[in-house]
């Protein structure tokens, strides 16, 4: 789905998404995009459980479990594997994150290549917007790269074992519930099974 001027709510992808080939165009950020769900001006309560695999030559690719570029992403999650071979950013929730909160990733995220970067939440955090109250379970970094002049926006991306209501207060909102099965917070709508 791609709809830059609209809102996407409660959408999901459960299938595998893959691309192998030569990317055309420029050789820098935002050249090519691949995601489990898609892109919109605003995305909420969306999720991906499918495997996302990208193998490229030339070009630069943003790859994300939910979205390739996040303008406003809230209450979304990814459980699928996200992998990039080539140049670009790979993120569990979003390839390039600009603004969003209360998202999580439990899928494995990898990026291989000279100019490839991976993050459990985002491959790249750009600008000075609010990115907070996100969590992940993997052993990687919260983001592959950050471009900003201040740090607090991203400081609340936590490993699940370190989450408290004090350091991620929004995760106790009406959208979340504790899962005994998973031993962590999950979304009430579009629940992780």
Predicted regions and their residues:
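Predominantly extracellular beta-rich ligand-binding scaffolds that present long acidic/polar faces
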Residues: 1-193
């Amino acid at each position: 789905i791609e709809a830059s001027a609209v809102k996407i709510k409660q959408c999901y992808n459960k299938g595998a998404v893959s691309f192998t080939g030569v990317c055309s165009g420029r050789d820098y950020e935002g050249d090519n995009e691949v995601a489990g769900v898609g892109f919109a001006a605003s995305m909420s309560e969306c999720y991906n459980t499918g495997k996302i695999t990208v193998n490229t030559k030339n070009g630069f690719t943003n790859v994300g479990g939910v979205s390739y570029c996040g303008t406003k992403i809230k209450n979304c999650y990814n459980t699928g594997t996200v992998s990039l071979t080539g140049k670009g950013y790979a993120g569990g929730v979003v390839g390039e994150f600009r603004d969003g909160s209360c998202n999580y990733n439990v899928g494995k995220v990898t990026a291989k290549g000279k100019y490839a970067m991976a993050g459990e939440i985002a491959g790249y955090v750009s600008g000075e917007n609010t990115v907070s109250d996100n969590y992940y379970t993997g052993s990687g970094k919260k983001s592959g790269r950050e471009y900003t002049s201040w740090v607090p926006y991203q400081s609340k991306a936590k490993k699940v074992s370190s989450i408290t209501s004090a350091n991620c207060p929004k995760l106790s909102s009406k959208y979340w519930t504790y899962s005994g099965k998973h031993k962590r917070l999950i979304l009430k709508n579009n629940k992780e099974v």
